Protein backbone atom coordinates (compact mmCIF):
# COMPACT_ATOMS: atom_id res chain seq x y z
CA UNK A 1 0.00 0.00 0.00
CA UNK A 2 1.21 3.50 -0.77
CA UNK A 3 2.12 5.76 2.11
CA UNK A 4 0.38 9.10 2.52
CA UNK A 5 3.41 10.87 1.04
CA UNK A 6 3.21 8.76 -2.11
CA UNK A 7 -0.54 9.25 -2.35
CA UNK A 8 0.19 12.98 -2.24
CA UNK A 9 2.89 12.53 -4.90
CA UNK A 10 0.37 10.73 -7.13
CA UNK A 11 -2.13 13.58 -6.68
CA UNK A 12 0.58 16.15 -7.46
CA UNK A 13 1.50 14.28 -10.65
CA UNK A 14 -2.15 14.05 -11.69
CA UNK A 15 -2.32 10.27 -11.36
CA UNK A 16 -5.95 9.23 -10.85
CA UNK A 17 -6.74 7.83 -7.40
CA UNK A 18 -8.18 4.67 -8.95
CA UNK A 19 -5.21 4.15 -11.31
CA UNK A 20 -3.91 0.93 -9.74
CA UNK A 21 -7.27 -0.62 -8.89
CA UNK A 22 -8.74 -0.10 -12.36
CA UNK A 23 -5.70 -1.65 -14.02
CA UNK A 24 -5.26 -4.31 -11.33
CA UNK A 25 -1.64 -3.31 -10.86
CA UNK A 26 0.36 -4.84 -8.03
CA UNK A 27 2.25 -2.55 -5.69
CA UNK A 28 6.01 -3.11 -5.73
CA UNK A 29 8.27 -2.28 -2.80
CA UNK A 30 11.67 -0.75 -3.44
CA UNK A 31 14.54 -3.22 -3.32
CA UNK A 32 17.15 -2.36 -0.72
CA UNK A 33 19.88 -4.91 -1.46
CA UNK A 34 21.30 -3.97 -4.86
CA UNK A 35 24.54 -4.57 -6.74
CA UNK A 36 26.00 -2.78 -9.74
CA UNK A 37 25.76 -4.56 -13.09
CA UNK A 38 27.45 -1.96 -15.29
CA UNK A 39 26.56 1.26 -17.05
CA UNK A 40 23.64 1.67 -19.43
CA UNK A 41 23.79 3.18 -22.92
CA UNK A 42 24.37 6.70 -21.57
CA UNK A 43 26.87 5.70 -18.88
CA UNK A 44 24.53 5.65 -15.87
CA UNK A 45 25.39 2.77 -13.52
CA UNK A 46 22.59 0.21 -13.29
CA UNK A 47 21.77 -1.94 -10.28
CA UNK A 48 19.80 -5.12 -9.70
CA UNK A 49 19.23 -7.43 -6.75
CA UNK A 50 22.08 -9.93 -6.28
CA UNK A 51 19.96 -12.79 -7.67
CA UNK A 52 18.81 -10.79 -10.70
CA UNK A 53 22.34 -9.49 -11.29
CA UNK A 54 23.75 -13.02 -11.31
CA UNK A 55 21.07 -14.25 -13.72
CA UNK A 56 21.40 -11.16 -15.93
CA UNK A 57 25.17 -11.54 -16.17
CA UNK A 58 24.91 -15.26 -16.93
CA UNK A 59 22.31 -14.50 -19.61
CA UNK A 60 24.47 -11.76 -21.17
CA UNK A 61 27.42 -14.19 -21.27
CA UNK A 62 25.33 -16.95 -22.85
CA UNK A 63 24.02 -14.51 -25.46
CA UNK A 64 27.58 -13.34 -26.19
CA UNK A 65 28.59 -16.98 -26.76
CA UNK A 66 25.88 -17.00 -29.46
CA UNK A 67 27.22 -13.69 -30.86
CA UNK A 68 24.28 -11.71 -29.47
CA UNK A 69 24.95 -8.50 -27.54
CA UNK A 70 22.46 -7.62 -24.80
CA UNK A 71 22.69 -4.09 -23.38
CA UNK A 72 20.97 -2.85 -20.26
CA UNK A 73 18.98 0.35 -20.65
CA UNK A 74 17.41 0.39 -17.19
CA UNK A 75 17.48 -1.77 -14.09
CA UNK A 76 16.39 -0.70 -10.60
CA UNK A 77 14.45 2.55 -10.34
CA UNK A 78 13.48 4.19 -7.07
CA UNK A 79 10.01 5.65 -6.51
CA UNK A 80 11.58 9.11 -6.72
CA UNK A 81 13.36 8.38 -10.00
CA UNK A 82 10.10 7.02 -11.45
CA UNK A 83 8.36 10.25 -10.41
CA UNK A 84 11.11 12.30 -12.06
CA UNK A 85 10.63 10.41 -15.35
CA UNK A 86 6.94 11.33 -15.23
CA UNK A 87 7.67 14.98 -14.35
CA UNK A 88 10.01 15.29 -17.35
CA UNK A 89 7.38 13.89 -19.71
CA UNK A 90 4.70 16.20 -18.26
CA UNK A 91 7.05 19.16 -18.75
CA UNK A 92 7.54 18.05 -22.37
CA UNK A 93 3.78 18.31 -22.92
CA UNK A 94 2.64 14.70 -22.61
CA UNK A 95 -0.60 14.02 -20.77
CA UNK A 96 -0.61 11.82 -17.69
CA UNK A 97 -2.78 9.34 -19.58
CA UNK A 98 -0.21 9.05 -22.36
CA UNK A 99 2.61 8.69 -19.86
CA UNK A 100 0.88 5.97 -17.82
CA UNK A 101 0.52 3.78 -20.92
CA UNK A 102 4.33 3.62 -21.06
CA UNK A 103 5.55 4.35 -17.52
CA UNK A 104 4.07 2.91 -14.35
CA UNK A 105 3.31 5.33 -11.54
CA UNK A 106 5.70 5.37 -8.58
CA UNK A 107 5.02 2.26 -6.50
CA UNK A 108 3.79 0.21 -9.46
CA UNK A 109 6.90 -0.30 -11.60
CA UNK A 110 8.62 -3.67 -11.68
CA UNK A 111 11.86 -1.71 -11.83
CA UNK A 112 11.40 -0.90 -8.12
CA UNK A 113 12.05 -4.57 -7.33
CA UNK A 114 15.51 -4.63 -8.88
CA UNK A 115 14.51 -7.74 -10.85
CA UNK A 116 13.47 -6.12 -14.15
CA UNK A 117 15.64 -4.95 -17.02
CA UNK A 118 14.98 -2.93 -20.13
CA UNK A 119 17.15 -4.48 -22.83
CA UNK A 120 18.59 -3.07 -26.05
CA UNK A 121 20.97 -4.33 -28.69
CA UNK A 122 23.16 -2.69 -31.30
CA UNK A 123 21.19 -1.87 -34.42
CA UNK A 124 17.79 -1.34 -32.82
CA UNK A 125 16.40 1.83 -31.26
CA UNK A 126 16.14 1.43 -27.48
CA UNK A 127 12.72 1.25 -25.86
CA UNK A 128 10.82 0.87 -29.12
CA UNK A 129 8.86 -1.95 -30.73
CA UNK A 130 11.70 -2.07 -33.26
CA UNK A 131 13.53 -4.25 -30.71
CA UNK A 132 11.21 -7.15 -31.58
CA UNK A 133 12.87 -7.34 -35.02
CA UNK A 134 16.34 -7.81 -33.53
CA UNK A 135 18.37 -10.98 -33.20
CA UNK A 136 18.61 -10.15 -29.49
CA UNK A 137 14.82 -10.28 -29.09
CA UNK A 138 14.65 -13.61 -30.92
CA UNK A 139 17.44 -14.94 -28.71
CA UNK A 140 15.65 -13.76 -25.56
CA UNK A 141 12.42 -15.40 -26.70
CA UNK A 142 14.22 -18.71 -27.07
CA UNK A 143 16.58 -18.50 -24.09
CA UNK A 144 15.59 -15.96 -21.41
CA UNK A 145 13.45 -18.52 -19.58
CA UNK A 146 16.54 -20.62 -18.85
CA UNK A 147 17.73 -17.73 -16.70
CA UNK A 148 14.36 -17.01 -15.09
CA UNK A 149 13.50 -13.99 -17.25
CA UNK A 150 10.26 -13.46 -19.16
CA UNK A 151 8.79 -10.61 -21.18
CA UNK A 152 6.33 -8.92 -18.85
CA UNK A 153 4.30 -6.71 -21.16
CA UNK A 154 3.25 -8.56 -24.33
CA UNK A 155 0.73 -7.10 -26.76
CA UNK A 156 -2.70 -6.54 -25.20
CA UNK A 157 -1.42 -7.22 -21.69
CA UNK A 158 -4.03 -7.03 -18.92
CA UNK A 159 -2.38 -4.06 -17.16
CA UNK A 160 -2.91 -1.55 -19.97
CA UNK A 161 0.74 -0.92 -20.76
CA UNK A 162 1.99 -0.63 -24.31
CA UNK A 163 3.73 -3.64 -25.80
CA UNK A 164 7.27 -3.65 -24.37
CA UNK A 165 9.42 -6.25 -26.11
CA UNK A 166 12.44 -4.74 -24.32
CA UNK A 167 11.14 -5.28 -20.74
CA UNK A 168 12.16 -8.58 -19.13
CA UNK A 169 11.88 -9.58 -15.48
CA UNK A 170 12.34 -12.48 -13.08
Which residues are covered by each model-predicted region?
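Extracytoplasmic cell-surface/polysaccharide-interacting catalytic and binding patches
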Residues: 1-75, 79-170
Amino acid sequence: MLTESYQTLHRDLGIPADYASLRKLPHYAEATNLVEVGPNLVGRMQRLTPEAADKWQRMVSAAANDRIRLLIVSGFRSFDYQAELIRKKLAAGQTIGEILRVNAAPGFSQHHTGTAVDVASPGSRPLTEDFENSDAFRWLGENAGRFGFSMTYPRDNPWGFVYEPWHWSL
